[in-house]
């Protein structure tokens, strides 16, 4: 399955691929081989990049799911106005080779959305959390409030978020993507029992990163 969030970019890439293939037919020999290789390479890269595999979402209602594929880059205690004092930040680094579609970590209602333009520092630079372009999303339900942020990086400079304030969302459902990877930060309340540690691999919509008490 291919992600609908990158449909425009995917179509453009495939059209360029066809143009390269057509140009290759005009020139004989090595030039033709170069154009043909570039055409196939671009098409395969576009299909690989915008892949959107199905996921088996855990049925546990108090489970907080990973919102992104990648690896846990950072875990630390912070204070956040939406989640309160002694909240826990979990940062997930998404490489260009990960699936880039983001998923909702917990069932609830979207109570807050805030887009901030900014820099494009490397995603593994922790200053990127505050300084980089990002979309901050606040979710609440009867148990808790959580906040998660799509953070653009040095390569990833396009954030896609389909959410609106007031939307009711299901855990594990798709809500957007960050093109070419980067990072996704999630802040959970103090009462959350984490089940991941730094370096753990995460799969969006499947990996349980913690349980809300």
Curated annotation (Swiss-Prot):
In this UniProt entry, the residues modified to Pyruvic acid (Ser) are: 182
* UniProt catalytic activity: a 1,2-diacyl-sn-glycero-3-phospho-L-serine + H(+) = a 1,2-diacyl-sn-glycero-3-phosphoethanolamine + CO2
- Database matches in NCBIfam families: PRK05305.1-2 (NF003678), PRK05305.2-2 (NF003682), PRK05305.2-5 (NF003685)
Q: Does the keyword Cell membrane apply?
A: yes
What's the main place this protein lives? Answer: membrane
EC class of this enzyme? lyase
Which UniProt keywords are given for this protein, alphabetically ordered? Cell membrane, Decarboxylase, Lipid biosynthesis, Lipid metabolism, Lyase, Membrane, Phospholipid biosynthesis, Phospholipid metabolism, Pyruvate, Zymogen
Q: What is this protein called?
A: Phosphatidylserine decarboxylase proenzyme
Subunit note: Heterodimer of a large membrane-associated beta subunit and a small pyruvoyl-containing alpha subunit.
Gene encoding this chain?
Answer: psd
Co-factor(s)? pyruvate
Q: In which pathway does it act?
A: Phospholipid metabolism; phosphatidylethanolamine biosynthesis; phosphatidylethanolamine from CDP-diacylglycerol: step 2/2
* GO molecular function annotation: phosphatidylserine decarboxylase activity
Q: Which Pfam families match?
A: PS_Dcarbxylase
Entry coiled-coil feature ranges: none
EC number(s) for this protein? 4.1.1.65
Instruction: Spell out the post-translational modification annotation for this entry.
Output: Is synthesized initially as an inactive proenzyme. Formation of the active enzyme involves a self-maturation process in which the active site pyruvoyl group is generated from an internal serine residue via an autocatalytic post-translational modification. Two non-identical subunits are generated from the proenzyme in this reaction, and the pyruvate is formed at the N-terminus of the alpha chain, which is derived from the carboxyl end of the proenzyme.
What is the UniProt remark on how the cofactor binds and its stoichiometry?
Binds 1 pyruvoyl group covalently per subunit.
GO terms under cellular component: plasma membrane
Provide the site residues for: Cleavage (non-hydrolytic).
181-182
